[in-house]
Every structure is written in C-alpha cells, then in structure tokens.
C-alpha cells in the first residue's frame, strides 16, 4: 500500500497529536536539516532578510518541507553561491498523522472490521501552520536579495494553499529594524551573538556597565 496523498490531511481537525510514550511507532520526518548554508556567519554579514509566509491555516507535511528546502537551497547555491546565504526552516513537523488501513482485495470483508476500532496507526508527520506564520526565511547580502526572493518563489510551489513572499524590514534574523540596528551598532548598544544580536539595556548594576553608558535613555 502506497503513501496516502497529503491532500487528505491538509485541513486542521482536532487537537495536536504529537509523538509521545502513548503514541509510538511514528516514522521519522523526511526533513532532518533546518539550517542550510552559512549558518555560522555573524549578524553583520547578512543584513537582507526575506520570509515565505503562509496565508492559510493548514497542515504541511514533512515531505513538502523537505522538497521546499531542496528547491530553495539548489537555486541559491546556483545563483548566489554556497557561501552567500543562510536558509532556515521555521516550522517543525510535530503533529502525527494516522491511517486506518482498509483491505481492497477479494474476501476483505472476512478479514477486517470496517469502522470498528478505527483510530488508526501512525503514517507520518506534519506541521500545523497558522495564517501569517513564517515557513522559510533567507538572510543574505543586499546584492543577492532578488535571488533569495526567486528561490522562495520556487519553494512556494511545493506547499499547498497560498503563501506570500515578504521582504523583512528587520536586520537579518534579528528583531531590530535596519535603521535602528545601524544606530544602536554605532552607539555600541548591541553585541553580535551568532546570527542574532544582544541588546545592552540601561538596567542592572552600575559596576557592570561600560564607561560612558551609565545613564542611557530607557526608551529602547
């Protein structure tokens, strides 16, 4: 018996059903890598960021996530280079899908009980996605921004429903706007922390603050 199409499980029905000690025998998700490209590049290297945002409430299978990751990564490597971007998958397939197998051969009515005890067994996994939730994010240099948008456009065909490609106003994967980040960086109020940035607030002991930054305005 082949794999049941994901269109049968597209609608979100009922509660989340994650893998647990009560839900055993779940197949591993097809997607195993969630960060692709130069994931160790600092926050200053890639200022441009673009998101692929879901515009429907639905289930997205792990096979679709893996197919989108491969399509996006392949185009970015070919067009921008393997050292010029960082791709991140923003959803994880924790929801377990079930199937109540039915026999279709001759004499099947003697072997099975129909809809009696029809809870089903684990078939695969999917991610429960809400409206406005980010599916994929790519950060890169400004010169490769159009390549990143085209890569996400190609990845969009791997998903059901509707998605939108939104260019972020933030600096990379941080929570700061680009203008604010540049200003705070000049004032030395943000410290690079991997792909993110740590904000130095005006709270805490005076002895731990740098000279000249003891009494900063608290509107940030």
Swiss-Prot record:
Induction: Not regulated by UV-B. Under UV-B conditions, RPL10 proteins interact with several nuclear proteins, including RBG7 (glycine-rich RNA binding protein), which has an important role in mediating innate immune response to pathogens, and BTR1 that specifically binds to tomato mosaic virus (ToMV) genomic RNA and inhibits the local spread of virus. GO terms for cellular component: cytoplasm; cytosolic large ribosomal subunit; cytosolic ribosome; extracellular region; nucleolus; nucleus; plant-type vacuole; ribosome. GO terms for molecular function: mRNA binding; structural constituent of ribosome. Transmembrane segments: none annotated. Ribosomal protein involved in translational regulation. Contribute to general translation under UV-B stress. Involved in the NIK1-mediated defense response to geminivirus infection. Acts coordinately with LIMYB as a transcriptional repressor. The keyword Ribonucleoprotein applies. Ubiquitous, with the highest expression in flowers. Expressed in seedlings, leaves, roots, stems and flowers. Expressed in young leaves, mostly in dividing cells and in the hydathodes, in the root tips and lateral root primordia, in pistils, anthers, and pollen grains, and in developing seeds. Component of the small ribosomal subunit. Mature ribosomes consist of a small (40S) and a large (60S) subunit. The 40S subunit contains about 33 different proteins and 1 molecule of RNA (18S). The 60S subunit contains about 49 different proteins and 3 molecules of RNA (25S, 5.8S and 5S). Interacts with NIK1. Interacts with LIMYB. Keywords: Cytoplasm, Nucleus, Phosphoprotein, Plant defense, Ribonucleoprotein, Ribosomal protein. This is Large ribosomal subunit protein uL16z. It holds the Pfam family Ribosomal_L16. Disruption phenotype: No visible phenotype, when heterozygous. Lethality in the female gametophyte, when homozygous. Enhanced susceptibility to geminivirus infection. The gene is RPL10A. GO terms for biological process: cellular response to UV-B; defense response to virus; developmental process; translation. It is found in: Cytoplasm; Nucleus. Belongs to the universal ribosomal protein uL16 family. InterPro entries: Ribosomal_uL16, Ribosomal_uL16_CS_euk_arc, Ribosomal_uL16_dom, Ribosomal_uL16_euk_arch, Ribosomal_uL16_sf. Phosphorylated by NIK1 and NIK2 in vitro.
């Amino acid at each position: 018996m082949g794999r049941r199409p994901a269109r049968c499980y597209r609608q979100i029905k009922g509660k989340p059903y994650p893998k647990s000690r009560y839900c055993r025998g779940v197949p591993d998700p097809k997607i195993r890598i969630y960060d692709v490209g130069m994931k160790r590049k600092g926050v200053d290297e890639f200022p441009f960021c673009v998101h692929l945002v879901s515009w429907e409430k639905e289930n997205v299978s792990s096979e679709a996530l893996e197919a989108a990751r491969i399509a996006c990564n392949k185009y970015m490597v070919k067009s921008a280079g393997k050292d010029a971007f960082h791709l991140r998958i923003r959803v994880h397939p924790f929801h377990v899908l079930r199937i109540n197998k039915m026999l279709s051969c001759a004499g099947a009515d003697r072997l099975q009980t129909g809809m009696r005890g029809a809870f089903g067994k684990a078939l695969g996994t999917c991610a429960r996605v809400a409206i406005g939730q980010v599916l994929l994010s790519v950060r890169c240099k400004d010169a490769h921004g159009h390549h990143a948008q085209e890569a996400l456009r190609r990845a969009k065909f791997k998903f059901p429903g509707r998605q939108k490609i939104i260019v972020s106003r933030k600096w990379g994967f941080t929570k700061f706007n680009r203008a604010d980040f540049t200003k705070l960086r000049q004032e030395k109020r943000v410290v690079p922390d991997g792909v993110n940035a740590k904000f130095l607030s005006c709270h805490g002991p005076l002895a731990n603050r740098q000279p000249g930054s003891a009494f900063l305005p608290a509107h940030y």
